[in-house]
Amino acid sequence: MELNNLKPAAGAKHAKRRVGRGIGSGLGKTAGRGHKGQKSRSGGFHKVGFEGGQMPLQRRLPKRGFTSLTKEFVGEVRLGDLEKLPVDEIDLLALKQAGLVGELTKSAKIIATGELKRKIVVKGLGATKSARAAIEAAGGSFAE
């Protein structure tokens, strides 16, 4: 095999279809665009989602939900993540240093996902009822 002898597989390449070049080509006269109408004209296109003047689907459906402005300031931490932390006293600063919450986070809440088997002390963080129960069952406590 030599680089100057490489060829594409048979049938892999197709000549570009030339339109508007006579009856014999099969795509002469109207060049495959049919007769008249918006789509046959030069520049004849419509916006994506335009339904011919009918109220578009996107506007017929109701708006839902909103974007919370406080989302980036409130963090969630799993019990399983706390298990991996090397420190026993857990507060917002420890979570930021471990990269479990973002730098902009102003408050965090512990949720009961995963397992906690060691004793920890939680300072200044919220927790769900089940997360609080799991921490206390493992011998941990909450210091406000």
From Swiss-Prot:
Keyword field: Ribonucleoprotein, Ribosomal protein, RNA-binding, rRNA-binding
Composition bias, Gly residues: 21-31
Lineage per the UniProt record: Bacteria, Pseudomonadati, Pseudomonadota, Betaproteobacteria, Burkholderiales
Superkingdom of the organism of origin: Bacteria
Organism: Burkholderia multivorans (strain ATCC 17616 / 249)
Gene Ontology cellular component list: cytosolic large ribosomal subunit
Protein encoded by which gene: rplO
Family assignment from sequence similarity: Belongs to the universal ribosomal protein uL15 family.
SUPFAM superfamilies to which the protein is assigned, alphabetical: Ribosomal proteins L15p and L18e
The protein, known as: Large ribosomal subunit protein uL15
